[in-house]
Regions:
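Transmembrane helix-loop junctions in multi-pass membrane proteins
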Residues: 49-61, 69-72, 92-104, 124-136, ...
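Flexible loop linkers connecting adjacent transmembrane helices
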Residues: 1-30, 224-249, 282-288, 350-360
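Membrane-embedded translocation segments of transport machinery
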Residues: 98-182, 200, 243, 250
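A generic transmembrane alpha-helix motif of multi-pass inner-membrane proteins
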Residues: 128, 291-353, 362-392
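Membrane-interface loop-to-helix entry segments
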Residues: 39, 43, 56-62, 79-128, ...
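Helix-loop-helix module between adjacent transmembrane segments
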Residues: 2-15, 21-22, 26-56, 62-95, ...
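Juxtamembrane helix-boundary/capping and inter-helix hinge elements in multi-pass membrane proteins
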Residues: 9-19, 28-31, 67-68, 172, ...
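Extracellular/periplasmic helix-exit of transmembrane alpha-helices
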Residues: 2-9, 14, 123-139, 182-184, ...
Length: 392
């Protein structure tokens, strides 16, 4: 639904589209500019404050990759970590300052490959332990319907963790992925709704399920068969996952698989970081399209918040409180976005009815009783097929 609204109310900026939750929020709430500026500002703050946590994830993954490859543990004050910081800041600056088209040019090449590699590696590990699959289902179903899980604190803890990690994984209903939906060049708004729905399915039911299989099969996430150490597992997510991979993999393959899994994890975090800053830039266009203002957002993300995240790692600081802030900000974005979805639902249903009646044919916003800047006869042209643009 939110992706369809993002498509409906997107706007054209030279050779690219901009849009998302602040844009459709402004239109749905009376087209008041102050509403759009407020929503855009809220998202920019949200996105930029998520950057340090992703920076931390990148360091964690690359540090583990290097430790596994060399067989030696590297401290945060080592030359390795300073090298990671230098490469990370430089690559982010080059990509972000080059504009959204440059970011999408590279992420479109990284994301499919890393997703396919991660799924393939996960399936390989599961197949290597296929004899333990019945134990997996017995543990999951037995734990879910045990009296202490149903009526005790375990259910509440599991539910809270599930909601937080679910939002973190697919962002459904949160409004924070709508900027990506808006920039897509579609023939009908509902097309992007179907694409984003598949994204939620893939993130949650494929990626998360494969990860869960490995963690539960290894059974390293519990102190005992009946007592889950949630706090410890939450504080060391990648450590627990990598240890699970090692426990389930033959000794001849464990180092190779850990290196590959760590690489996938680092790429996931890196592309998420790029996405957050790019989405902040898209939202900033609603406040001002001044080239200086947009450049300022790019600089703030790539040369302030990314280095800040790197410095927190090099200083040896733990980001437990930052994760708590991230979880809170995710919930706040849901509370902002859900009322907007309720307001926009009639338009989405009308657009879907048109999509079915016209079999995905030409769409004009006037057919569902709303005027937009893009879905009019004079704007029905596709974007030029260019992959990179210089900073504007």
């Amino acid at each position: 639904m939110e992706s369809v609204l993002a498509q409906l109310f997107k706007e054209r900026k030279q050779d690219e589209f901009v849009g998302g939750m602040p844009y459709y929020g402004q239109r749905l709430l009376g087209n008041r500019r102050w509403v759009g500026v407020t929503l855009a500002s809220a998202f920019i703050v949200y996105a930029l404050f998520n950057v340090p946590s992703q920076t931390f994830n990148i360091f964690t993954a690359l540090g583990m990759l290097a430790d596994t490859a060399t067989g030696q543990a590297s401290g945060r004050q080592s030359a390795l970590y300073y090298g990671i910081a230098l490469v990370l800041v430089s690559s982010c600056a080059w990509l972000i300052l080059g504009g959204i088209r440059r970011v999408t040019h590279w992420t479109n090449r990284l994301v499919p490959g890393m997703a396919a590699a991660f799924c393939g590696l996960s399936l390989l590990i599961i197949l290597l332990n296929i004899a333990a699959i019945p134990d997996f289902f017995a543990l999951v179903l037995g734990g879910a319907f045990a009296p202490d899980a149903l009526f005790g604190g375990s259910m509440g803890i599991a539910l809270a963790e599930g909601v937080r990690r679910g939002l973190m994984s697919n962002e459904a209903g949160q409004g924070t992925i709508t900027m990506a939906a808006a920039v897509a060049d579609n023939d009908h708004p509902c097309e992007q709704g179907f694409v984003q729905a598949m994204g939620v399915f893939f993130d949650t039911l494929v990626i998360c399920t494969l990860t869960g299989f490995i963690v539960v099969l290894a059974h390293l996430w519990t102190g005992s068969a009946s007592s889950a150490e949630w706090a410890a597992a939450s504080a060391a997510r990648l450590d627990v996952y990598v240890a699970s991979v090692q426990a389930l993999t033959p000794a001849a393959l464990d180092r190779t698989l850990v290196i590959l899994v760590s690489t996938c994890y680092a790429l996931f975090a890196f592309t998420t970081l790029l996405g957050m800053i790019s989405f902040a830039e898209i939202s900033a266009n609603l406040i001002s399209r001044s080239p200086r203002f947009i450049l300022g957002i790019r600089v703030l993300g790539s040369l302030v918040f990314v280095p800040f995240g790197a410095l927190t790692v090099l200083a040896g600081l733990e980001l437990g409180n930052l994760w708590a802030i991230t979880d809170l900000s995710n919930i706040l974005m849901v509370y902002i976005n859900i009322p907007l979805l309720l307001l926009g639902a009639p338009l989405v249903y009308r657009a879907l009815a048109h999509y079915r009646a016209a079999d995905g044919g030409r769409f004009l916003s006037a057919t569902i009783g709303v005027q937009t800047t893009h879905w009019v006869a004079s704007e029905q042209t596709h974007l030029p097929d260019t992959e990179e643009t210089s900073p504007r």
